[in-house]
Amino acid sequence: MRNLIKNVFRSFRTAKIALIALTFLIFVAVGSFVLLNNTVNNFNASFQHVTEQGQLSNAIINERYDFGKLEFQKTSNDATSSAQPSVSTRSTLTAQKANGANSSFTLTLTPDSRTSFINNALQLKPDVYNSLVTVTFSYGSESDQTKKTQIEEQSKLIAANNLSRALQTDKELLVTGQLEQLKATFRTYKAINITDQGVFKKLIASEPTDQVNRLVLFDGHQLARSRQVEFNELFSQFTQVQAKGKDQLSTTLKNGNYEQLLQAIANNFGSSETELLKEIQDALKQTNSSTTLAQTQSSQQFSKLKNLFDSGSTFTNIAGKLTLQWMEGTNKKQLVIFDPSSYETVVAPGNWSYEQQQGKAVYQDINHWNRIKRLPFNEFEREFQKIDKRYKMLVDKIEYLILGVGITPDFVYPVFSESLLIPNTANEQLYYVNQTGYERTASSFLTNPTETGIVARLPNLNHDLDVINQWAVKNMSWPPNLKAAYSNTDTTNILNLLAARTVFIPNLINTISLVSSFLTIAILLVAIFVTILILVSYLKKNTEQIGILKANGVSGRKINLSLLIFSLIPGIVGSFIGYTLGISMQNVAINLFSNYWFIPTQTSSFSVLGLLFFALLVVLMMSGISLFVGWLILRQDVVKILKHDSEFKVSHLGLWAKWLFAKFGIMTRFRVALAFNAPWKLVFLTLMSALTMMILNLSFATKDAFQVAQTKTTLTQSNHQYEFELASPTEQSGLLKWQLFAELGATDDRTTDAVKLANRRMEIQSVDESKKWKNQQVINFVTDATGFSNDINYLENIVQSKIGLDYSLGFGNVSSNPWKLSETLMPANQASASNTAFQNFLKAIIVIDPNEGGKYIKQTKDEVTVRFLYEIDSSKALKNGNTKSVNKIQKSTAAPQAQQGQSNQLMLDNDFAKFLYKQFNLIKEGGKADPVDLNNFDFANQNQIKRFYSKYNALPPVDYKLAFNVIGLPKETIANQKDAPLFGFLTLQAQLGNDAIKIKGIKDWKLDNTNLGPVLRTNEDEIINQRLFSKPNGIIINSSAAKKYRLKEGSQLHVKIHNGYKRVNAKLVNQDPTLTATFNIVGINNSVHEPEFYTSYKTAATLLQYPNEWIEKQLPFNSFYANSILPFTQSTSLFSESGLFPGTSSFAANNTVLTEVIKKTIEGGKTNSKTDVQKRAAQATANGKYNSSQNNKMNYERLQKALGITSDLDSSKAGEYATILERVYDGLPYNSTISFISNVQANDALFANIANTTQQIQTAAIGIIIPIIMLIVLLVSTTLIQELKKIAIRLKALGYSNPKILLSFLSIYLPLFIFGLLISIPISIYLIALHNQVIFSSAAILLEATLNFPTVILSMLVLSGVLSITFVLNWLELNKIKIAKEIKNS
């Protein structure tokens, strides 16, 4: 046995290449598996740790309740007290039940304020809510009519507030009650987004008691529990005590449970307040005694404690602390009850490495921190400032102490917002604070975007979601087609950011695991083949020795066991190196995924057991293969083994090949015989060579394919950066109105023969400048202050902004703030943007003109952030007026006291209105600025505002516009046109087979540098736009569309169109609204990214069924090209498909507000004849005022049109009409006008990312495959030549030189190249086509990679270079041969 083993070891010299190759393959297989498998396991362990410890939610619920207007009307118990109330300031009033009819009055919730939510509350809890919707108040001893009116107005506010508070806190009415019944665990999720010096910071509220999505720590200490609940209770207690009056303080404290409040006040007073502290201590002692405080000797002088609850004292619950301010004589005093835990934060691990680079560290001295937290507020602040800055983080000027590093499971993949879907830890920072910590910052950034919702763990997810959604249909105000509750993995819901945050990580782990398994199996299969090759080669080379051994009685089993060395040594060495390297490379692998992985991950440590396991596994597998192959060969009889061993045996294929070359010389026939002598090895080697050339061909052919494709795609764009897709008009909506963005809200000039569009302009005659601003930018004083929620069309065609709307206006018996309702109709992020823009606007005004701006704008310095907050000074912006014209308008409906001149009107001051118009004009001038200056403007940068004003004598577009059926366009889009924007076009929403496509109807633009539309080119670079305008129903498609749908020039395209102008008419009568169209393909554009379709504007407009006179003037449009994003970032345009703009958020049959509005619209439309309306309108115009009643007839007609009913409407069928609106308009009164924006730069970047990612994957794959295949080719070819060594010795003895001998041996490469080429070329063509198809299917990029002659030659040269290594190795081997010795040994 020893001799057998020695013989095997001696053969290592001749099989060293094979052994190295086998060791290398085992090393790669084990190393790859260990590395990737451990990475997957480590990732999965970290992810599971966070999700299990943090209790990841499985559902999200978005709350939206319709409390309605909460408007109360008076039902008088006193015949003498029927005066029309006027607007008065909000003040505290004690509501009491009346003792007599003459001293009381009753307020009842108006019918159109009784939303379905309130009606549900009345059904569920009538005892509670009947007393809240009908409330009796007392005038007390007041007899003055003006004072009574003020009491009535204040009482309305109190009644509304009481009802609102009850509705918002009643769990039985809210979804939280449903969740409790379902035994779900849940919590409220709150986050605020803040941009701080170019860094996007997100603060998330988190409590240690959270049961869902709780904070999981990796380092440091947990956040302390906040005192927010306690603060809310203290605030409520103080309000109750103060409302009952300081004179009743003794009785109030005795009868109520206010010990918590008194103790909290006492705990936060300094020792200097000895008298006050003594009074509080006495109060605490007496609260449980039978005597009142007034009866005790110690409390007879009770002035100090009473001062705290005086009507002039204030108690605020802001910024995470309670602040009590009161007066003692002329001295103003202050007490702060604060929560020191509001200064704590935990940093997300994804940001922590970056923070550490900036020198930040976790504060570890928790005992010192706990001591500081026990100090009074002022001392705490001083001690807090002494802590080193390296332990703190800043949000603006607000400091937090870094206590730890941690994450909640919903932010494992930290997607920050809809626009920030790719995490960037340097510029996007995530911090956790408790509830008071959250309030501490949120109170200083009230206008910033926030995320809110309920996150829950539902026991039976699908069932519970159905239950909640069915409940929400009846109790929430979402449109019927939107779900309030959905799974956290529901990627179809665009609002579900949690899906983007949690679904990605499991997908990433599964992908890595799949790649690991595939790669390991592939490499192991190659290793098995190499093992077989080595064994077969060894056994054949040592046939004689094996035969002699068997003849001498050595068993085949022993011989076979000796062969195990061939698998044992490579297996052990390869496994050891592979396992060691795989373990050591874990951090490298984790870092490779650093763009996707943001939580700390522990790596697996080196394990002797792990090493032994992998070594044993590989050895067993390779040994099994070795034993099996050896058994197959060694089972032959000894005679057969020794027979003809010394002869060169030519295979049948070799003999047949020799016969084909019978007429050639002997050496030629000899070389042919050599080439075909080992058919199976030749076949395998040929396949490997073909595979090598195929992969090389693919690599070379696709090398620049992406760059070429991107170049072609970029050529289709000409100058524009953005493509906006808008809502498509209907007959009910009318055409979209457009304006220059900077002039949005102004009256623009139109030609006299222009078709009247959907906009109507409202006159404001009282201010001269308003003649230029009629659409209107500033509210029409009376119109929006009277019955604004009772008009079905109250928002129609009005351009608004917060600066022109945010005023509480009074007229007659109505007080309203138009902005409040407009804000509720905006998406939350746009409402926040509007509030932010409002601050920037006021700041800009102050910056460019401090004197004039200071007249109307108040600046308040935030003590925490040291930032200025700006607001309009209402005392200077508004005026009270008793105008004769207003009284005349009211006479027909006003009460007798109103006719006596008791009516007050609160309106904008004329000088202030002129001041606003001046600012709008400055913005209008700013619209003429260079687009570069506009697009790159930092609205919060004071110096940039100054520079802009100095350069253009104008303001940038700082005012955020809210428009209805109106869209602001950049000047380059309009291009000096009057009736239609030059670079506006029509998009047909079409269906081709089962695919949704977009066909763009473009105009015949002049194709020069000012053109913003596409320049369509063929592969020969011929511009073919004009073909659209010279042939009927012509369409140009791009190369991608031609490939995907197998189309060509001359083919026809049959589609269905879904956005026709008359589509609603069809839906109203339950007909199919789709239109059919047939196009003739007149050209193929060379763009290769995603299918594109272009037709002429006229063809598109005709197919969409717009009137011919509109088409001739090119008035309709639903898309446009631009170089500016401002129409989206600095404005909100809402579109109503129905043409209706009611003051409610949904069309639904159970929407009480909607049905009331429909009733009033029908009743108003029937009672106002056309003559009466004209008379009222003429009177209103003459007086410079506008009364909403003149809208009634128009509103009635628009409602008829929206419903598709030409006969008279019946107010008793309001519910039926609401059902029609819900069905036809999908439950949505309005939607965003802008439905899609295509960013050329973003598309190019996406294209580049896809290209780079694909190329990297391709390079990595080829980088692994090519070396392995070439190693096999080298191994097999070397083995083949080694087997011919005996022949080489004989040829050398016959006098042949080494080069001639080698050339003879290299003849085996001839069929390899010939057959390799024959196989590789067609398969390469197929592979390249398959590669193109895969990229096209997955990324919608059409690559035109093809196989050409230079590519084939280059691949052959590379393969020849690899095979030349064999030539060199054998040259060296032949030079070492000593003929006499070799003949003797043989």
Curated annotation (Swiss-Prot):
Cell compartment(s), UniProt: Cell membrane
Keyword S-adenosyl-L-methionine part of the UniProt annotation: no
Keywords for the protein's UniProt record, in alphabetical order: Cell membrane, Membrane, Transmembrane, Transmembrane helix, Transport
Main location (coarse class): membrane
Membrane topology: Multi-pass membrane protein
A Pfam family the protein falls into: FtsX
GO CC term (a single one): plasma membrane
Signal peptide start and end residues: none
Regions that span the bilayer: 17-37, 402-422, 494-514, 518-538, 563-583, 592-612, 613-633, 682-702, 1261-1281, 1310-1330, 1349-1369
Organism superkingdom: Bacteria
GO MF: transmembrane transporter activity
Family assignment from sequence similarity: Belongs to the ABC-4 integral membrane protein family.
Protein's recorded name: Uncharacterized ABC transporter permease MG064 homolog
